[in-house]
Amino acid sequence: EIPLRLVGSEMCIRDSYNDNRKTLSYPVVRSFIKLELARVISEKFENVDAIAGVATGAIAQGALVADLLGLPFVYIRSTPKDHGLENLIEGELKPGSKVVIIEDLVSTGGSSLKAVQAVRNFGCDVAGMVAIFTYGFPVAEAAFKDAKVTLTTLSNYDAVLEEAVRTHYIDESEIAVLQEWRKDPANWDPK
């Protein structure tokens, strides 16, 4: 889904939620994503000790990838549980482990980098983050750079726009508006 809806001749851009969890319902798509995430991790990162998924959207794919790679899996909550052990990281993770974090979608990077910080605070090395999709918002790119985290994604906003043009969901004339929205979606004004 892209953040565009045509209403008559007026173009309306709204906040969009790219729900990658729906891909879990389609075995061929689910398997493709699992294989591609595993391929990226195998090619980009050496001597990985564990895979961590960001709750909740990346738990399932993270577990599938960890299983395929034969690695331990943990997941990272956005906030500690308020009962029981009150864990932020669920599963067995040893301090000093080299961890690749899997995320489903990166928008501003806030929740993703909070997960990175949780793993670092636990005493582990974050090798990098691999995600299914990113909007490529400038604020996220700057945040990942500041946090010194390598982010690799399977797809991105530009690829979605290219596919939307190719399949005639939008036409070339609408690309500039959609790219302008991406620069600062919170303050975007369609004028």
Which functions belong to the PLM regions below?
Residues G62-V100, T108-K114:
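Short, glycine/charge-rich flexible loops or terminal/linker lids adjacent to PRPP-binding catalytic cores
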Residues E46-A55, V130:
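Short glycine-rich phosphate-binding loop at a beta-alpha junction
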Residues E1-G8, C12-I13:
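Single conserved hydrophobic/aromatic residue that forms the stacking wall/gate
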Residues Q117-K191:
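PRPP-dependent phosphoribosyltransferase catalytic core
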Residues S16-S31, S107:
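Glycine-rich phosphate-binding "P-loop"
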